[in-house]
Amino acid sequence: SVGFKAGVKEYKLTYYTPEYKTKDTDILAAFRVTPQPGVPPEEAGAAVAAESSTGTWTTVWTDGLTSLDRYKGRCYRIERVVGEKDQYIAYVAYPLDLFEEGSVTNMFTSIVGNVFGFKALRALRLEDLRIPPAYVKTFQGPPHGIQVERDKLNKYGRPLLGCTIKPKLGLSAKNYGRAVYECLRGGLDFTKDDENVNSQPFMRWRDRFLFCAEALFKAQAETGEIKGHYLNATAGTCEEMIKRAVFARELGVPIVMHDYLTGGFTANTTLAHYCRDNGLLLHIHRAMHAVIDRQKNHGIHFRVLAKALRMSGGDHIHSGTVVGKLEGERDITLGFVDLLRDDFVEQDRSRGIYFTQDWVSLPGVLPVASGGIHVWHMPALTEIFGDDSVLQFGGGTLGHPWGNAPGAVANRVALEACVKARNEGRDLAQEGNEVIREACKWSPELAAACEVWKEIVFNFAAVDILDNK
């Protein structure tokens, strides 16, 4: 007779272990689980632990050839979500041996691979991950980080200013370069390729890189400030992407860009390593994130994607604005902004942070606020994001009635006025509009911008909200 009992057994017998004490080296995950009717939460939580680690649907004889106790994921706690019917937070601990060192790709393949198609669950969302220091240390992380970036750019004590060049598609390379030059000479620190600008028939990448480099060196010479343009190196293959990054380095520009979710984590980590080795900053766009993170009960929360990016590598990442046209509730946004910038972040459920995270000196990432923001938002943005951030005004620069350069001037004046007021001890949350109005008196460009955008509001409730306490 065979030495094991065939047949199907309940997951919870093996994978639900409420008495388990988590180890410092475990990767911990918090899943929001919605079981199918009739499936008990312990079975659902155990099923998640099993399917994302060593389990399969039946007992197999090869189980006897290894030590499941050493390698299995364990569901060690389950809590009911207040105010939601049939939703639970299942906490799962994974032994570190299950993951390849330095590979975000492998980590996600395990933790959020097959398990999301699992029939016993109606829906499943990964809310947070605790990455243990032992695993963090196998990653290079951001190519440079916040302090090195400030030193490279020689810009201190204020947020950085950016602008996405619009119309995003259709401009020729020369006209695109003109738009870049006007924005940079007006006072912005950066301009940006839109995420879907790669290498299209109307503007091939090499032409764009050349004209943008010319624009930024010209603006640099005129203003005496270091300028940058995020040259989007995203391409159809890793080799092509690196070829574009090499060309950017040869031109002597300071920064390139990547769409990390559509490009993929393997490509992103490859580019991040190249950028560190060659002194390029790396701006990260999160195109496609809402496909993954927008549903409250299914998918992956953006704070997990943000943590993954810090491990994979990037110096800037888009993180919502709290005040503009794109998703972002204040407490939640600030929660993952801290996870991007700080070295040590305490568990804080009021901000959606399920685990204490120690980054053990991995460089930080600058959050980028972008999307539907304009000069009237400047006090709120300065207040919410603080100095270590990039504020990006696309339409809020190029939509200025007098053109790009005056639009850039308006934004720079508004920013400098807000920073000055804050440093003098004024409360931007209360006096913000007053600060902007005062600045209008000596900046006609700002006054014109304030007139254009005084009525614009994007009034929609955020989809991503915290559970009732």
Curated annotation (Swiss-Prot):
Residues annotated with N6-carboxylysine modification: K192
Modified sites of kind N6,N6,N6-trimethyllysine: K5
Reactions performed catalytically: 2 (2R)-3-phosphoglycerate + 2 H(+) = D-ribulose 1,5-bisphosphate + CO2 + H2O; D-ribulose 1,5-bisphosphate + O2 = 2-phosphoglycolate + (2R)-3-phosphoglycerate + 2 H(+)
Cofactors, names only: Mg(2+)
EC number per UniProt: 4.1.1.39
Function of the protein: RuBisCO catalyzes two reactions: the carboxylation of D-ribulose 1,5-bisphosphate, the primary event in carbon dioxide fixation, as well as the oxidative fragmentation of the pentose substrate in the photorespiration process. Both reactions occur simultaneously and in competition at the same active site.
Superkingdom in the source lineage: Eukaryota
GO MF term list: magnesium ion binding; monooxygenase activity; ribulose-bisphosphate carboxylase activity
Cited SUPFAM superfamilies: RuBisCo, C-terminal domain, RuBisCO, large subunit, small (N-terminal) domain
Protein family per UniProt: Belongs to the RuBisCO large chain family. Type I subfamily.
PANTHER family registered for this protein in UniProt: RIBULOSE BISPHOSPHATE CARBOXYLASE (PTHR42704), RIBULOSE BISPHOSPHATE CARBOXYLASE LARGE CHAIN (PTHR42704:SF16)
GO cellular component: chloroplast
PTM (free text): The disulfide bond which can form in the large chain dimeric partners within the hexadecamer appears to be associated with oxidative stress and protein turnover.
Protein name: Ribulose bisphosphate carboxylase large chain
Residues binding Mg(2+): K192, D194, E195
Pfam families listed in its UniProt record: RuBisCO_large (PF00016), RuBisCO_large_N (PF02788)
Coiled-coil segments: none
Active site per UniProt: K166 (proton acceptor), H285 (proton acceptor)
Bound cofactor: record note: Binds 1 Mg(2+) ion per subunit.
Miscellaneous section: The basic functional RuBisCO is composed of a large chain homodimer in a 'head-to-tail' conformation. In form I RuBisCO this homodimer is arranged in a barrel-like tetramer with the small subunits forming a tetrameric 'cap' on each end of the 'barrel'.
Binding site for substrate: N114, T164, K168, R286, H318, S370
